[in-house]
From Swiss-Prot:
It comes from the Bacteria. Belongs to the bacterial ribosomal protein bL12 family. GO terms for molecular function: mRNA binding; structural constituent of ribosome. InterPro entries: Ribosomal_bL12, Ribosomal_bL12_C, Ribosomal_bL12_C/ClpS-like, Ribosomal_bL12_oligo, Ribosomal_bL12_oligo_N_sf. Residues 100-131 are annotated as: Disordered. Keywords: Ribonucleoprotein, Ribosomal protein. This is Large ribosomal subunit protein bL12. Residues 100-125 have a biased composition (Basic and acidic residues). It holds the Pfam family Ribosomal_L12_N. SUPFAM superfamilies: ClpS-like, Ribosomal protein L7/12, oligomerisation (N-terminal) domain.
């Protein structure tokens, strides 16, 4: 690949899921294309191939979202500190996240990072799920 395409690829890797979805919409509008899979795509598959596909998709999941589901009132300050540490948000933004649960804290991260973030938030008193 050329240096220009390598640079674009590296920038794409840093996007959050929300930013990537927004980019897809903008590309669809700008170029008049659709990112949706063709409707007849499943018909062309060999019999039996369709049964294996869902299992492969589950195994291939490499990006996880850490969602803060609930924060007890007496644990808000401790959880707020961890949210700021994990996200780099300012005090006001982190407070809004903690007070508007359920809310994603980190998106599109590795399983190890998601588990570490979950442990930190749970140790501080928050209820967390990984999706």
């Amino acid at each position: 690949m050329s240096a220009a395409t390598d640079e674009i690829l590296e920038k794409l890797k840093t996007l959050t899921l929300l930013e990537a979805a927004e980019l897809v919409k903008q590309i669809e509008e700008a170029f008049g294309v659709s990112a949706a899979a063709p409707a007849g795509g499943m018909v062309m598959m060999a019999p039996g191939a369709g049964a294996a596909a869902p299992a492969e998709e589950v195994e291939e999941k490499t990006a996880f979202d850490v969602v803060l589901d609930d924060v007890p009132a007496d644990k808000k300050i401790a959880v707020l500190k961890i949210v700021r540490e994990l996200t780099g948000l300012g005090l006001k933004e982190a407070k809004e996240v903690v007070e508007s649960t359920p809310k994603p804290i980190k998106e599109g991260i590795s399983k190890e990072d998601a588990e570490a973030a979950k442990k930190q938030l749970e140790d501080a008193g928050g209820k967390v799920s990984i999706k």
